[in-house]
Amino acid sequence: MRNLGSKKSLFMKKIIQTSEAPAAIGPYSQAIESGNILFVSGQIPISPKEGKIVSTTIAEQTEQVFSNIEAILKSAGYSFQQVVKTTVFLTDMSHFATMNEVYKKYFTENCPARSTIAVKELPQGALVEIELIATK
């Protein structure tokens, strides 16, 4: 853990990293835990084993994103039931319904707050990226 402020600060952060999800492709962590809150960086559909985008379909890409997120959540001792906020980035809003079909497999009741944002493009040509916040 690292102190985020002065000596008087109570805010600490723990870097979460797992080989079960793709390594960060830039200067950021897979996730950061501060107190009882977990901040998961945006995940794109990179296979951690192959190191590349898994598919060209939105359904398969969304499944891979959730697989990556699940690995990060588990490595930090969290589950999908503890997610309180998600942000979904789509390169094409016509993919919204298909992404939603996959999304609702992971959030069946007591769904987290969510924003869905259309973006021009995502890293490595991904069609979807999802970031989230979970709490214990």
Regions found by a protein language model. Name each.
Residues 2-11:
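Short, Lys/Arg-enriched N-terminal segments with co-localized hydrophobic residues
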